[in-house]
Amino acid sequence: MEVLNICQVEELEMRGDSMTCKLVDKGSVNQVVQQQGEWVHLGSGEITIDSAADESCWPIDEGGAFEIRSSKRNILLKAANGQAMRHLGEKDVTFKDEMSGEVLGMTFQVTEVKKPLAAVWRLVEKGNLVQFGPSDAQCFIQNLQSGKRIQLHKRGGSYILKVEYVRWVPVFPGHA
């Protein structure tokens, strides 16, 4: 199974009934996962692409299937109005792009935001080009190494990535 990632998936690890997906901080995008199992659908959603965000942020009350872990960095997060926000840790979120069906992954800082926000500079840092244009066809994230594109959609004054949240569930051979 090939996994296309905004951030490369290094390792999938089960802890209890939740999955930990470790992401590599590199620009490459393709990774083959050598483990038997399947991606389980957790629901559909949207991630807003934010060109002004300092970090990719995730709402406190969303994505319970993805474990929150302590951040390795001490981050001071502020809302657009300058108000300080609590930083509760970070989580790796896996999802399928609605158009290609390919599995993607990103690390988000968990804080007091209303919706998931992907920081453009973080996407660029991972080796991607982020393009906004007047039509949906001109709005995408493109990995510079592979050339693969992820379609974005314009909604009002925002650009969004429509996704299906998924979690890797291993299947152990010989167990029914």
Residue ranges of model-derived segments:
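Generic N-terminal initiation segments characterized by hydrophobic and/or small/turn-forming residues
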Residues: 1, 9-11, 20, 63, ...
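Generic structural hydrophobic/aromatic packing signal, biased to beta-strands
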Residues: 6, 21, 77, 93-95, ...
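Aspartyl protease active-site motif detector
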Residues: 32-77, 107-112, 116-119
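Residue-level detector of intrinsically disordered, flexible termini
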Residues: 51, 78-79, 136, 175
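Sterically constrained small-residue positions within well-ordered secondary structures
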Residues: 40, 68, 84-86, 97-99, ...
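Aspartic protease core domain of the pepsin/retropepsin superfamily
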Residues: 56, 89-176
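C-terminal reverse transcriptase regions that engage the nucleic-acid substrate
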Residues: 75-89
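Intrinsically disordered, low-complexity interaction arms of viral/retroelements
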Residues: 1-43, 51, 158-176
